[in-house]
């Protein structure tokens, strides 16, 4: 899978100027920002949407919540242009913050549900977007959000999900979302670049692991471009990247099976994968011992022509599914 990164410094003088003039002063004083033109106008070209500081949260950003606000107008435009949102989409935005992306997403979609865990930021965002059609601010933990219920309440079958994800909670968020994969049309996330490499890694490579299998079971994931620390306020210690996910059918989907049956199998398989990668470089049988008898795991992998000492990181998504299927009767 091809991986494309944006060179830094930017090759375009205009891009560099846009980045430093819109962000430089914000790096000295962390501030929340909003796309002024996108919020206040019916429709403006993306190039005309500029980020302008509106206020600081009264207590500043909260490091424990992994808050790094996207403050670069140049990269915000690139992200919106790269995210495959359709005009009739219901978009769920994870970690809306101060709305740096919310207005721009709403210009492309039918409706945006901006989910923000921080009650202070959610309240401020409601005030800023008061009266703006097509945007709903929801103060909630994404890990407690039921996508099926959300889609049902908005009269749609699927949703598109976007987020600038807190680096420390990327895996739990993906695990939670993919339990409801049939309700997701597509996804795009800004994540730590190291995490992006893990998501797109192939079996047997150093970055390959639980995140790789999690993403690749239900999507074709690719890195769109990288984002430097200076595009955020406060700047993180690492580079970030935009990763897009084109959803595919999962291995659990069987002809004639009901959606409920598929969902149950999907959840069991995701839990199986999580257990299989519980400790890196440990044998699959040992990692799964809390869920399945170790002898049953070894017998299952040997029946598939694999070594009884195999590790999860050596197996492809298809291999892991075969092992899971072989173990179905051993619990």
Regions found by a protein language model. Give the residues of each.
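Intrinsic-disorder-associated, low-complexity terminal segments enriched in Asp/Asn/His/Tyr and depleted
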Residues: 18-19, 25, 37
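A short, ordered amphipathic alpha-helix with a cationic face
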Residues: 19, 258-260, 272-275, 286-289
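C-terminal lobe and adjacent flexible extensions of AdoMet/dcAdoMet transferase-like proteins
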Residues: 275-331
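Catalytic cores of RNA-modifying enzymes
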Residues: 38-267, 271, 302, 329
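N-terminal chloroplast transit peptides
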Residues: 1-6, 14, 26-27, 48-50
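Short polybasic linear motifs
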Residues: 9
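Compositionally biased low-complexity segments enriched in histidine and/or tyrosine
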Residues: 28-34
